[in-house]
Amino acid sequence: MQDGIALERKTKEELKQIAQGLEIERISVLKKDEIIEKIREKRKLLEEKKLSDAQSQQKKRERPADAVEGKGILDVMNDGFGFLRVSNYSSSRSDIYVSPVQIQRFNLKTGDEIIGDCRPIQDPDKYAPLLFVKSINGDPLEIALKRKPFEYLTPIYPTERLNLDNGGQGNAPGKLIDLLSPIGKGQRGMIVAPPKAGKTTLIKTIANSITKNHPEVKLIVLLIDERPEEVTDMKESIDGDVVFSTFDQMPENHCKISEMVLERAMRLVEQKKDVVILLDSITRLARANNLTVTPTGRTLSGGLDPDALYKPKKFFGAARNIREGGSLTILATALVETGSRMDDVIFEEFKGTGNMELKLDRTLQERRIFPAIDIIKSGTRREEAMLSNLEREAAWHIRREAAKTSNAEVMSLLLKIINKADSTRDMLDTIIKYYGKN
C-alpha cells in the first residue's frame, strides 16, 4: 500500500497509473478529484479484505493442544522471515520463528512487539514457530494493517511538556529542568556531560519522574558500552525497559541493539503512542559505528570516519512530535572533556542538531551541588510553548543573575529555595520576589 503519499500532489496521469494498478475501471472519463476518491475507496476495500483474509486464515488453523503463549520483539531478516527476540532485543535459543507469510499478511515490521501462540520446541536445534498472532504492540491486528509508515508522519515542534516535577516539596532536579530546560513530548535533547558530573544519577531521576508523572509514556533506557554493574543498578532503579550492550561486547552488537531500539520506538509511534528513549551515550554509539563502518579513506580529526556518524544521526534525528498523534522523545548524553579528540569531534558534529540542551558543570559536582546544571548554557528551543508566564519570568531572573554572578552561587541559592518551598508555585513566587529586587 502506498499509504501516506499525498494523492493531491500527483498529476492526473500519475493518478491514472495508480488507478490502473488497482484495477479501477472507466478512469478516462473521471475528473482528478473523482479519481482520488476512487483510489481511496479501493485502498480501503483492499485493507478490509486483507484483514478479513488474515483473520479467516488464523481461524482455519486449529490451535494445537500443546500450544503456549509467546511474546517478543520482531527482527525481520533479509530473506523475509523473522524471529521474536525475547531477551534484551538480542538473539537467543528462546527466540520464536516467524514465517514470511505471517510477516506479509499482518504487515509486520522489525520492532513490533508480537503476542501469539507458538508450538513448543520439539527439536533442540530448531526454534519454536509462531502459529497465531493475537496482538501487535498491544493493539488489535487491524491497527497494524492501517498504520502509516514513520517516514510519512508529519514532524512538528513539541507542545506538551513532560513534567518532571511532582508538584510537592524537594525534587530539585525535576523542578530545575522543568524551569531552565523543559522537555516536551517529541524533544530531541542532548545532555552534555563531562566525567563525574552526575549524568547517570540525572538519567535515573528523569526516568523515574517520567514513569511516575506520565504512565501513558513508553520508557526505554538504552545503555551502550557501559559497565555491567551500572546496567544492574539502572534495572533496579527505574521502572521501564532497560536495553543494554556492555563494554565487553563487540561493537557490532552495540550497533545492532541501537537499531532494534530505534525500530521498536518507530513502530510504537506509528500506532500513535508516546515513547521516550534515554540513551547513554551517543558518543560511545558513534565510536562503535566508527569501528564497524567500511573505511572510506577519509578521516576527521581524532580518527573519526565521516560515515560513522550516519547511523547515530539517524537515531538522534528520529525524535519528533507527530501531528497525526504520538511522539518520540530522545535524550542522549554526549561526553566532553574526556581527553579524547574523537569525543570532542563527535560532540561538535551533533551540536545544533537537537532542540534542547542540558549542560552539566563538573565544578558544581566537585562542590557536591546536584544537579550540576550550567544555567547559562542549558536551554530549549521554543520553550515559551511549554512554560507558563510565571515560569518564564522566574527563568529570566535566574539566567540574568547567573550571567551577573556565578553559576555555583545561583545554583546554591536555588537549591535552598526549592528545599524550603512547600510547592512549585511557592518556589516560583520566592524566586521572582528575591531576584526582582536586584
What is each PLM-predicted segment?
Residues 54-144:
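N-terminal "pre-motor" subdomain/linker immediately upstream of P-loop NTPase catalytic cores
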Residues 64-70, 172-176, 261-266, 315:
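Phosphate-interacting basic helix/loop segments used at nucleotide- and nucleic-acid interfaces
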Residues 197-198, 206-438:
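P-loop NTPase catalytic core
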Residues 183-203, 225:
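Glycine-rich phosphate-binding P-loop
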Residues 1-81, 88-94:
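Charged, low-complexity terminal tails
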Residues 66-68, 76-80, 89-92, 108-112, ...:
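Short flexible coil/turn linkers enriched for glycine and charged/polar residues
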Residues 120-191:
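P-loop NTP-binding catalytic core
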Residues 26, 91-92, 104, 123, ...:
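Short beta-strands and strand-coil junctions in structured, solvent-facing domains, enriched
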